[in-house]
């Protein structure tokens, strides 16, 4: 008996994002074989989005690009960004998921950022590079991310993405409630 397959395209080749998509889908659809593939997808926003709206738009742009390139059951994009809120600077990620003609948008948890990190980002640096310098790491954005470093490993970029994906999947899990 052949197992049913769900094909997922992730708008990034970053292993953290690909693993988060695979993990979330495996939790949501344990009876299916999940085939997850990453692909380079342009965000159409700055490499380090500095606003909530740019971050959200980057995720949407990546999903739309993937939909135009290859056939799949689901398309995922995760875009990390920063913004300065009334409580201070924070980093977060938007999740865009497309399935058939429907698009769902979700957002991961907010991680407060030290002001010195935010100031470096305002000066044009990317968060991963700033964190690598501050914590003497290499390519942290493809590992635990700023989340892993600032929480001392109690949460990671991947765990945040996985939870955000699960939440953003709600309209697909309950389509009758989301007309």
Swiss-Prot record:
Key word Manganese present in the record?
yes
Q: Which domain of life is it from?
A: Bacteria
EC identifiers of the protein: 3.6.1.73
GO process annotations (BP): nucleotide metabolic process; thiamine metabolic process
Q: Which InterPro entries does the UniProt entry name for this protein?
A: ITPase-like_fam (IPR029001), Non_canon_purine_NTPase (IPR002786), NTPase/PRRC1 (IPR026533), YjjX_NTPase (IPR050299)
Which cofactors does this gene product need? Mg(2+); Mn(2+)
Q: Which residues bind Mg(2+)?
A: 71
User: Reaction(s) catalyzed by this protein?
Assistant: XTP + H2O = XDP + phosphate + H(+); ITP + H2O = IDP + phosphate + H(+)
Query: What does the cofactor section's free text say about binding?
Result: Binds 1 divalent metal cation per subunit; can use either Mg(2+) or Mn(2+).
Binding annotation for substrate: 71-72
Keyword list, A-Z: Hydrolase, Magnesium, Manganese, Metal-binding, Nucleotide metabolism, Nucleotide-binding
Short name of any one Pfam family annotated for the protein: NTPase_I-T
Q: Name one GO molecular function term.
A: nucleotide binding
Its biological purpose: Phosphatase that hydrolyzes non-canonical purine nucleotides such as XTP and ITP to their respective diphosphate derivatives. Probably excludes non-canonical purines from DNA/RNA precursor pool, thus preventing their incorporation into DNA/RNA and avoiding chromosomal lesions.
Subunit and partners: Homodimer.
Q: Which family does it belong to?
A: Belongs to the YjjX NTPase family.
Name of the protein in its database record: Inosine/xanthosine triphosphatase
Q: Which organism is it from?
A: Shewanella sp. (strain MR-4)
Recite the lineage of the species. Answer: Bacteria, Pseudomonadati, Pseudomonadota, Gammaproteobacteria, Alteromonadales
């Amino acid at each position: 008996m052949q197992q049913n397959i769900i094909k997922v395209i992730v708008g990034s080749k970053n292993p953290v994002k690909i693993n988060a998509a695979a993990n979330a889908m495996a939790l949501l659809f344990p009876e299916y074989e999940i085939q997850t593939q990453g692909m380079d997808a342009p965000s159409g926003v700055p490499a380090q989005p500095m606003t909530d709206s740019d971050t959200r738009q980057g995720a949407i742009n990546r999903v739309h690009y993937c939909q135009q390139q290859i056939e799949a059951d689901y398309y995922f994009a995760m875009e990390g960004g920063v913004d300065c809120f009334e409580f201070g600077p924070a980093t977060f990620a938007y999740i865009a998921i497309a399935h058939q003609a429907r698009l769902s948008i979700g957002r991961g948890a907010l991680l407060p950022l030290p002001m010195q990190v935010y100031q470096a980002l305002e000066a044009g640096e990317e968060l991963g590079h700033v964190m690598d310098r501050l914590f003497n790491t290499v390519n942290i954005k493809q590992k635990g991310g700023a989340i892993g470093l600032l929480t001392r490993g109690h949460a990671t970029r991947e765990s945040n993405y996985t939870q955000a994906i699960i939440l953003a999947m709600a309209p697909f899990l309950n389509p009758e409630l989301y007309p």
